[in-house]
């Protein structure tokens, strides 16, 4: 769990990144604070913190890293570094632990961040977003003066009659001709909402990152045929022999239905937004040590769907219902700048969930007055054995930070040193890393 403090203007300075949990200190400002702190602690300490451990493979002794670079990275492969080049000068590297400093010092590497864990974030307020009005074309010629009756059949009409009435409306925004890309936990491709009236799949591509296989529409159609040949027309095992990708959490299927379900599974009653669109789905990979995917996998997924949409010459809406609350929230992290840059590639829009942390009290911010002290309390549960705190400020501002334990002991003032600082208070170990302004 993370709790974060502070939110300011662009060109913020991450003055400290603290973690409870904490070998070599590296002060290179081409790396983010959290990565520097992760590299400077012992492996035992790293294992006690989810945020510090994310991206490190203990068996291979490698780090997964996000880089912003220029030029050519092909020479890194000769040193045993795995390179995945993304669009617009972004890349994902799998670097042996002993080569991280070497990679950092390369002139073509502009900045490095470590991956972060992602969590579910989805909004389901279809009606509150006025989508019914958009789909129906309010103000047009309808078979019934009440638009809701055309959707839900309050007039007793059939689904066919309701669809015929909608076809007369001037707006008629159904998603036809558009691609919807769902980057999530996968999809139940056997669900009728993701099939055309003739029983073929609406999914053009399904990339299962866990298997690193891209399944085509033809393969999914073959799986659907095998499914229908079973007893009672439902042989899931036969289908999974052909396309063995499943959405175990159901989150991706629900998101896909909200965005693009055509309502066939409910006789047209529960229909999504772009119900005549076609889909591309990426099932984000889940490392064995974690329950959720990482930002690196999200970036690879966005790169894949945008490249594919451009090859097909189609507009695409990319839905991201995973996220996290890490960082300064000013749009300058490598993930955020990557998504900003990607909006100019081809014809696309990228949509991100607003999160589920509205009542979590995980952030605070405001203005400090000259010469005055402000106290901010952190609530830590009895069973919470590690958490992280970030403080961000504008570059020109100067202030000091100290910590007060539950017993009243004062720790600090924290020093402005570009290195790991270690403190101990009662049974709590505190690690701090002070950082200077960076380009990202």
Predicted region positions:
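Short strand-edge motifs at loop-to-beta-strand transitions and within beta-strands
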Residues: 91, 374-376
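Subtilisin-like serine protease catalytic core
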Residues: 167-296, 313-317, 347, 385, ...
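Short, well-ordered alpha-helical packing segments
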Residues: 104, 135, 152, 163-166, ...
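Short alpha-helical segments and helix-capping/turn motifs at coil-helix boundaries
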Residues: 95-98, 135-152, 159-169, 178, ...
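Surface-exposed acidic, glycine/proline-enriched linker/cap segments
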Residues: 132-161, 214-244, 429-440
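Autoinhibitory N-terminal propeptides
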Residues: 1-91, 98-169
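Substrate-binding/access-modulating region of protease and related hydrolase catalytic domains
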Residues: 286-368, 372, 383-410, 419-440
């Amino acid at each position: 769990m993370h709790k974060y403090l502070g939110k300011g203007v662009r060109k913020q300075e991450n003055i400290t990144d603290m973690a409870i949990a904490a070998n070599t200190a590296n002060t290179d400002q081409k790396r983010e604070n959290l990565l520097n702190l992760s590299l400077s602690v012992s492996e035992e300490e790293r294992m006690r913190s989810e945020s510090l451990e994310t991206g490190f493979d203990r068996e291979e002794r490698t780090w997964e890293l996000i880089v912003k670079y220029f030029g050519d990275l092909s020479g890194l492969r000769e040193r045993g570094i795995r390179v995945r080049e993304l669009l617009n000068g972004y890349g994902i590297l799998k670097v042996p632990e002993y080569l991280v400093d070497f990679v950092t010092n390369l002139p073509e590497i502009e900045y490095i961040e470590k991956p972060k864990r992602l969590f579910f974030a989805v909004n389901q307020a279809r009606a509150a977003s006025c989508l019914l009005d958009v789909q129906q074309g309010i103000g047009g010629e309808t078979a019934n003066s009440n638009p809701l009756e055309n959707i839900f059949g309050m007039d007793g009409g059939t689904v066919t009659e309701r669809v015929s009435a909608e076809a007369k409306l001037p707006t008629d925004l159904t998603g036809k001709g558009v691609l919807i890309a769902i980057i999530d936990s996968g999809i139940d491709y056997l669900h009728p909402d993701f099939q055309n009236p003739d029983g073929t799949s609406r999914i053009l591509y399904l990339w299962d990152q866990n298997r690193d296989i891209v399944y085509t529409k033809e393969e999914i159609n073959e799986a659907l045929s095998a499914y229908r040949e079973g007893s009672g027309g439902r042989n899931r095992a036969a289908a999974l022999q052909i396309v063995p990708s499943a959405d175990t959490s159901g989150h991706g299927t629900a998101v896909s239905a909200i965005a693009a379900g055509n309502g066939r599974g409910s006789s047209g009653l529960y229909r999504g937004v772009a119900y005549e669109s076609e889909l591309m789905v990426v099932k984000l990979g889940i490392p064995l040590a974690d329950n959720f995917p990482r930002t690196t996998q999200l970036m690879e997924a966005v790169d894949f769907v945008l490249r594919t949409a451009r090859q097909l010459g189609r507009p695409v809406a990319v839905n991201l219902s995973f996220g996290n609350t890490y960082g300064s929230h000013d749009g300058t992290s490598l993930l955020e700048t990557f998504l900003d840059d990607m909006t100019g590639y081809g014809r696309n829009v990228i949509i991100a969930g607003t999160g589920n942390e509205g009542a979590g009290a995980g952030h605070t911010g405001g203005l400090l007055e000259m010469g005055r002290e402000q106290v901010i309390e952190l609530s830590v549960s009895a069973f919470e054995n590690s958490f992280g705190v970030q403080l961000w400020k504008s570059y020109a501002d100067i202030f000091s930070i100290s910590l007060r334990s539950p017993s009243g002991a004062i720790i600090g003032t924290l020093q402005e040193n570009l290195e790991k600082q270690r403190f101990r208070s009662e049974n709590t170990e505190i690690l701090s890393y002070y950082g200077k302004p960076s380009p990202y």
